[in-house]
């Protein structure tokens, strides 16, 4: 998902306008030179925007430039490879997301083991996806949709932004937990998938909330539920899918990670400073503009989320026989 150029520039301008925080004096001699923050997606999407907000904050807090380095491709695995190939010295970091966990389970022969080669540093943001349908679909609720899908196995078309994508897996988890058969049709990105959904050639889609808000508000698409465990502040009257499928959670999270064996004191320093940013009202507001909720906590908290999602998505792919082509 990409944001319009005007929105993207507005958010970047907002990052530059964040109040300069005093540099933290610490005995730790880090950083003494620029730090690279690798992003596995092109400029303009939420991952890139979150990275630039955090990079700007850390640059001001720690007195050295944190430079965003976009390495898009292969479900963010190219970006991960750049980090696991770098020295474990804290000068090459990764803006990681749910996509990396899913890609690590989906693709074969990646040349790295994500859970062994990457150490989670700190969460940054949590955001929901939304399950939307074309208005021609008669179902007005999740239970109605499940009933229709059971009555018409293999006939309801589920569009996604591509094979192995996070939105596809949100749909696959729904299919598995609801025990329904939807026909998955992958597209080359959100734009063509949305075109067919709006045109009625596809029936249902799971996608990031910022992409869908305008279509939902204008009635061009009907929202049935959000993929997070709880409701979203953006659409508080919209139920979570988990209210009807207990345990369903396909949250999209973003955070900062480093090469494994990065010194613990560097990990702890970065965690402390990122949490300080997430507690800053201006930075928190910027995250909210792209649908994010601050994901505060220790590196151990983030590691627990990281490990839990790795297990969940790997088990889903095995149980549902989802394999890369």
Model-predicted segments: where are they?
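N-terminal twin-arginine translocation
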Residues: 1-7, 15-29
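N-terminal (or domain-start) structured segment
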Residues: 26-116, 155, 179-206, 296, ...
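A ligand-binding cleft/hinge motif common to bilobed small-molecule-binding domains
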Residues: 100-109, 175-177, 203-236
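An extracytoplasmic/periplasmic, membrane-proximal ligand-sensing/linker region
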Residues: 32-34, 176-178, 217, 240, ...
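Stable alpha-helical elements in mature extracytoplasmic
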Residues: 46, 50, 54, 79, ...
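Active-site phosphate/pyrophosphate- and oxyanion-stabilizing loops and adjacent acidic/basic residues
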Residues: 52, 56, 81-82, 172, ...
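Hinge/capping helix and adjacent helix->loop/strand transition within the periplasmic-binding protein
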Residues: 85-91, 105-192, 241, 246, ...
């Amino acid at each position: 998902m990409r944001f319009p150029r005007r929105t993207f520039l507005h958010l970047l301008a907002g990052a530059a306008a964040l109040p300069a925080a005093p540099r933290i004096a610490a005995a730790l001699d880090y950083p003494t030179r620029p730090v690279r923050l690798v992003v596995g997606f092109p400029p303009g999407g939420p991952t890139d925007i979150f990275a630039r907000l955090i990079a700007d904050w850390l640059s001001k807090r720690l007195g050295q430039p944190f430079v965003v380095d976009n390495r898009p491709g292969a479900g963010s695995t190219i970006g991960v490879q750049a980090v696991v190939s770098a020295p474990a010295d804290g000068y090459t970091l990764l803006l990681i997301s749910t996509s990396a966990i899913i890609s690590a389970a989906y693709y074969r022969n990646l040349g790295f083991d994500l859970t062994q080669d990457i150490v989670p540093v700190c969460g940054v943001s949590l955001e929901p996806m939304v399950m939307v349908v074309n208005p021609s679909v008669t179902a007005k609720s999740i239970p109605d949709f499940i009933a229709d899908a059971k009555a018409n196995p293999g006939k309801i078309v589920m569009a996604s932004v591509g094979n192995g994508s996070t939105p596809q897996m949100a749909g696959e988890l729904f299919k598995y937990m609801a025990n329904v058969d939807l026909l998955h049709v992958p597209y080359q990105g959100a734009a063509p998938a949305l075109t067919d959904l709006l045109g009625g050639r596809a029936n249902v889609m799971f996608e990031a909330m910022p992409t869908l808000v305008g279509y939902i508000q204008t009635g061009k698409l009907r929202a049935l539920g959000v993929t997070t465990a709880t409701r979203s502040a953006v659409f508080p009257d919209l139920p979570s899918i988990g209210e009807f499928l207990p345990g369903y959670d396909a949250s999209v999270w973003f955070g900062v990670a480093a090469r494994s064996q990065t010194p613990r004191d560097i990990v702890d320093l970065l965690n402390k400073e990122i949490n300080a940013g997430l507690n800053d009202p201006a930075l928190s507001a910027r995250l909210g503009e792209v649908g994010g909720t601050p994901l505060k906590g220790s590196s151990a908290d983030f590691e627990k989320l990281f490990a839990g999602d790795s297990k969940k998505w790997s088990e889903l792919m095995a149980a549902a026989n989802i394999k890369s082509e």
